[in-house]
């Protein structure tokens, strides 16, 4: 984000000094060739893993050709300098391509404070996943924490997010629609006949924003992206409630079928 870009720009403009890529103050690590008294600087060692994992120095390897340069490095703000200054310097010295983008994310806070064992405010992600599910946790973090900034999390907010967005909103919509089709259409999605304006408004509202959604994703604005998707789901619920397909079963089956086809199409689009 702009704030991180400004931070690194100012650091570079202030003047860069030579960086030693070896240390003599400890023994553990990778020895410098031809000088066992020196150990390779840990950040040179660690950052190189991005390409050594792709079988570098074999630049003809499919892994390397497919995944380097990286489209984006997503890294914590506390190690931004190592990725945005040192890592590009290492790559440029080796005449290797740079990652296309580096995105520095903020910290996840607990009760507005940095998580700390001494304070006792750590949320164990494994415990949370076992209790609520990994996709539910991912959804909550994406929706409630703006990627470029610090974000506060709490178990109460997590539960409210899961209940309000996933269970009561999208989950409830899917359950109602698919159970209705199971009971009244022998479990098969009926074909649509003639769509009315209200049907087109629902589906076009999402389709017309696809470019916006792609732009949000390219900018790593996942927070804004997911809020738009949640709005699509709320609108789909309203559509289903307002048009009451259950009231049309005996009076206008053709219209009922169109409503069902439209709402299932929208559920599919939201899921994608």
Predicted regions and their residues:
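Residue-identity detector for threonine
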Residues: 9, 24, 48, 59, ...
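Helix-rich, typically C-terminal accessory recognition domains appended to large enzymatic cores
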Residues: 144, 157-194, 205-272
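Conserved, non-catalytic sequence blocks in retroelement Pol enzymes and Pol-derived host proteins
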Residues: 197
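Structured secondary-structure scaffolds
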Residues: 1-183, 225-229
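Short helix-capping and inter-helix turn/linker motifs at the boundaries of alpha-helical repeat units
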Residues: 116, 201-205
